[in-house]
């Protein structure tokens, strides 16, 4: 019985992922995929004149002609 309880606790910890990571879209140029972000923050960066946004982990600063949206949920930068 103790072994079963211990197994359930381990499975729960693995499934809940207590590391506070989130999944973000990651895109540079034409390829798009997901990645696990340890920072817990995703971003979408849109540069004026560019047809596709850049996406990834973290939250870079915006600048003139560049709009950056940061968020903290799974796949929120899509």
From Swiss-Prot:
Keyword 4Fe-4S: no
InterPro entries the UniProt entry points to: Snake_toxin-like_sf (IPR045860), Snake_toxin_con_site (IPR018354), Toxin_cobra-type (IPR054131)
Tissue expression summary: Expressed by the venom gland.
SUPFAM superfamilies: Snake toxin-like
Pfam families per the UniProt record, alphabetical: Toxin_cobra-type
GO MF term set: toxin activity
Principal localisation: secreted
Signal peptide region: 1-21
Alphabetical UniProt keywords: Disulfide bond, Secreted, Signal, Toxin
Name of protein: Alpha-neurotoxin homolog 7
A cellular component annotation (GO) from this entry: extracellular region
Family: Belongs to the three-finger toxin family. Short-chain subfamily. Orphan group XII sub-subfamily.
């Amino acid at each position: 019985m103790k072994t079963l309880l211990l197994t359930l606790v381990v499975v729960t910890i693995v499934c809940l992922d207590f590391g506070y990571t989130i999944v973000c879209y990651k895109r540079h140029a034409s390829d798009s995929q997901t990645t696990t972000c340890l920072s817990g923050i995703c971003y979408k960066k849109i540069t004026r004149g560019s047809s596709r946004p850049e996406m990834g982990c973290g939250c870079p600063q915006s600048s003139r002609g560049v709009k950056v949206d940061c968020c903290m949920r799974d796949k929120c930068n899509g």
